[in-house]
């Protein structure tokens, strides 16, 4: 009997990336078939007001811990809650694949946001400190500036998954 593989993907971002999140979810779930099941986890957050009642940060963090792939969307600025979610992902990174997509044209003025460039420096330093295996560091340092690059990164990252299910995404053109 063939065992269906299930992969859990968490999409972390602010509501500004609604379109990208919808598109990413569509591209991922279109791959589902009798041998593959991709489950997308996402929470609709707008500042401190969670639109889905009961979605506390701890619930979100526990989902991140259980997911195989985490995709972060950020603009020029990134919110402290998203950084917190990234930290949770990194702390549990031994079996995870982390992708960072940045849309540099998106700007924020809220006080609770950190400049993305500063965050990326912190991110690189954090990786070096917590993951001493060079191949692991290389595996996680994927910054994508366009959705095409994000799709390509998922497609090319074959060796880090056995029979990487995401290679099938290559037949889809991501429009945005």
What are these regions (language model features)?
Residues 24, 59, 85, 118-122:
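A general structural detector for well-ordered alpha-helical segments in enzyme core domains, enriched
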Residues 44-46, 77-78, 94, 98-112:
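Short beta-alpha junction loops
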Residues 106-176:
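C-terminal interaction surface of TIR/SEFIR-family domains
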Residues 29-37, 92-97, 128-138:
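Structural alpha-beta junctions
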Residues 51-52, 76-95, 107:
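Conserved TIR/SEFIR loop-to-helix hotspot centered on a Trp-containing motif
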Residues 21-23, 82-84, 109-112, 176:
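A short acidic (Asp/Glu
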Residues 2-70, 91-92, 162-176:
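Conserved N-terminal substructure of TIR/SEFIR domains
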């Amino acid at each position: 009997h063939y065992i269906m593989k299930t992969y859990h993907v968490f999409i972390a971002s602010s509501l500004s990336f609604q379109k990208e999140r919808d598109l990413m979810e569509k591209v991922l779930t279109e791959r589902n078939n009798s041998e593959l099941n991709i489950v997308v986890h996402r929470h609709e957050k707008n500042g401190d007001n969670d639109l889905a009642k009961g979605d506390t940060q701890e619930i979100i963090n526990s989902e991140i811990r259980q997911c195989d792939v985490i995709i972060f969307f950020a603009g020029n600025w990134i919110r402290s809650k998203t950084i917190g979610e990234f930290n949770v992902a990194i702390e549990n990174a031994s079996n995870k694949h982390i992708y960072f997509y940045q849309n540099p044209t998106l700007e924020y003025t809220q006080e609770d946001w950190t400049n993305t460039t500063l965050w990326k420096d912190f991110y690189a330093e954090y990786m070096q400190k917590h993951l001493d295996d060079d191949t692991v560091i290389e595996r996680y340092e994927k910054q994508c500036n366009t959705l095409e690059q994000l799709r390509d990164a998922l497609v090319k990252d074959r060796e880090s998954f056995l029979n990487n299910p995401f290679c099938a995404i290559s037949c889809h053109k991501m429009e945005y």
